[in-house]
């Protein structure tokens, strides 16, 4: 299982040698992690991770969804159900189930990330199997008790320069405050994620809005609601936030008059919003958030196009983020036009667009980012954060948008130990792509070195204002 130093490089010797040289120049660069889902409490409390299953299996929906698809219950993986049904609590049993089914992950990015962590973090080069499951479990568990495996030590070991968490608009950010108060040098910053108080299609929307205005101390009116967002965005900024994040079902935007927007708010705040009103409210709020970003400087990320909770059985029994979200077709040209008509040429605005619809890369996203100064393309996301997905992304966007209308790499992960693995993968794939351009005489090698550095480090740091 030992990691091959030429993994993800071309099999053609000349191109592979170019990729080796390029990768050597970026391999040790610091990690900028501008968007992700690690827990701020890890850095605040700096406690040991409890066991291998809690570290690698239970929080990783890439892992749990694959096992679930093969007939293994989520309870058997230690996932707690909403109805109180018993779930497995023995970490060793969960690990054995994972190890016995390790073959399911052949050729997946999960295998790349896991084996990178095994070797580079724990020094384990055996391929996981039913036969060695207990031995590897014990080896990992022993190391997890040691000081060098605490979250802050790993932050330094991974050469992380900054990491952003993703946090609800009403989050008090107490763990971010604890990190700051501790005097530790690590840069752990929040990102403003207001979806719960913006998505009028959610059953808890009205209560989330009441919570938002309550925390902000503003009235429950359209203007009070907008002021509450401004208040909370400033609260996040004081704790280092540089971005907001918006996970909407579509990329639809709108630009209603103040009167129409106020009347729409009055309808949806009563609860049970119609489908059309919920969509229009989300659309208007993307435009309002863009307007706020011009005022306060937060970079705006839009992550549209996921059919959330597609499997109602999983959602009803286990809740959100259990691997049952599915990509759907997503349009951008017509949907973003109201926002772009108002703000697309404003140099104070940066909107980073992501997609789960790869067909939109060359048809819509690259042409849009190649024209509007306010737009940038986010990296390959979620299901396409993989060697083939990143390569397709480069091939489909570079000719129209270039490299400098993209923003480098996001690891976008809940799995802390996969952060260096994901950045290693992205740097290797980008270097392999650049090596091909050099070999084809479409790029000079000195230019490729510069682009490789920008993709690995500078673009993320610059775009996210880090």
Curated annotation (Swiss-Prot):
Pathways involved: Carbohydrate metabolism; pentose and glucuronate interconversion
Any one GO MF annotation of this record? glucuronate isomerase activity
InterPro entries linked: Metal_Hydrolase, Uronate_isomerase
| Enzyme Commission numbers on file | 5.3.1.12
* Short name of any one Pfam family annotated for the protein: UxaC
Q: Which terms are listed as keywords in the entry?
A: Isomerase
Q: Which organism is it from?
A: Brucella suis (strain ATCC 23445 / NCTC 10510)
Look up the record and give one Gene Ontology term from the biological process aspect. Answer: D-glucuronate catabolic process
Q: Which SUPFAM superfamilies match?
A: Metallo-dependent hydrolases (SSF51556)
- The entry's protein name is Uronate isomerase
Q: Which family does it belong to?
A: Belongs to the metallo-dependent hydrolases superfamily. Uronate isomerase family.
Highest taxon above the source species? Bacteria
| PANTHER family the UniProt entry points to | URONATE ISOMERASE
Signal sequence, renumbered to the chain: none
The protein's annotated catalytic reaction(s) are: D-glucuronate = D-fructuronate; aldehydo-D-galacturonate = keto-D-tagaturonate
